[in-house]
Amino acid sequence: AIFKSYCEIIVTHFPFDEQNCSMKLGTWTYDSSVVVINPESDQPDLSNFMESGEWVIKEARGWKHNVTYACCLTTHYLDITYHF
């Protein structure tokens, strides 16, 4: 799948600013007893990334999380969050 992501841009220190964006992939419909997601790597696949002449990705990492929410403290949900 190919995803598009939009992040809030803060340009206080333009043109020397750095932005941080996150993309969280997971399910709220099915818990970890039904759906297990595992990243292939902690580095996202950027093969379909479209470069920009205005900025570059300096670093990209991903982490898997086992999360519980206030509504359902005994139910665990998995997600993978990538930070750019």
From Swiss-Prot:
Glycan-modified residues: N20, N66
Superkingdom of the organism of origin: Eukaryota
Catalyzed reaction equations: K(+)(in) = K(+)(out); Na(+)(in) = Na(+)(out)
Keyword RNA-binding listed: no
Keyword entries, A-Z: Cell membrane, Disulfide bond, Glycoprotein, Ion channel, Ion transport, Ligand-gated ion channel, Membrane, Postsynaptic cell membrane, Receptor, Synapse, Transmembrane, Transport
Cited InterPro entries: Neur_chan_lig-bd (IPR006202), Neur_chan_lig-bd_sf (IPR036734), Neur_channel (IPR006201), Neurotransmitter_ion_chnl_CS (IPR018000)
Transmembrane segments: none
One Gene Ontology CC term in the entry: postsynaptic membrane
GO molecular function, one term: transmembrane signaling receptor activity
The keyword Ion transport is annotated on this UniProt entry: yes
Main location per the UniProt record: membrane
Disulphide-bridged cysteine pairs: C7-C21, C71-C72
Site residues by UniProt (Confers toxin resistance): N66, T68, L73
Entry's localization field: Postsynaptic cell membrane; Cell membrane
UniProt membrane topology term: Multi-pass membrane protein
Family from the record: Belongs to the ligand-gated ion channel (TC 1.A.9) family. Acetylcholine receptor (TC 1.A.9.1) subfamily. Alpha-1/CHRNA1 sub-subfamily.
Assembly and interaction partners: One of the alpha chains that assemble within the acetylcholine receptor, a pentamer of two alpha chains, a beta, a delta, and a gamma (in immature muscle) or epsilon (in mature muscle) chains. The muscle heteropentamer composed of alpha-1, beta-1, delta, epsilon subunits interacts with the alpha-conotoxin ImII.
Protein function: Upon acetylcholine binding, the AChR responds by an extensive change in conformation that affects all subunits and leads to opening of an ion-conducting channel across the plasma membrane.
Protein's name in the database: Acetylcholine receptor subunit alpha
Species, as recorded: Herpestes ichneumon (Egyptian mongoose)
